[in-house]
Amino acid sequence: MSRPTKFRKVDFFPKSTCFIPLGKPKCEVEEIALKIEELEAIRLKDIKELNQEECAAKMEVSRQTFQNIIDSARKKIAIALTEGNAIAIGGGNFKSKFCKFKCLDCRNTYEINCENDKHMCPSCGSNNIVCNKKTGSCENLCK
């Protein structure tokens, strides 16, 4: 029996999640799925220029796991660029300090940094809130 996949910590979510080669309709191109944690690995290593140990620590994984993640990401990006495929960013096994909350009193849904922000509804001020994602990433508020 294989070990369960450990959630990888991610601090960045892209505004754009689909990239299509110029001049090709989306329906005519093959789509490559790039996981959120793969994009985070690329961001930390290639943009932030952190070393492998720092990247692994930020994502809360081993150095070997980080290397596996970034190798997978780079291969997918290389295939998409050389073969003219679209890249769709989403999914994966990750956790984040950002979480969607729902107020049980006024039904407002909102997103906050669950590590730093106050756990009260910005609309009505109620503390009667729950995590709307139920992923465990905000720990005690996920029900």
Curated annotation (Swiss-Prot):
Record-linked Pfam families: DUF134 (PF02001)
Transmembrane ranges, per UniProt, are: none
The similarity annotation says: Belongs to the UPF0251 family.
What name has this protein been given in UniProt? UPF0251 protein CA_C3166
Species in which this protein is naturally found: Clostridium acetobutylicum (strain ATCC 824 / DSM 792 / JCM 1419 / IAM 19013 / LMG 5710 / NBRC 13948 / NRRL B-527 / VKM B-1787 / 2291 / W)
| High-level lineage | Bacteria, Bacillati, Bacillota, Clostridia, Eubacteriales
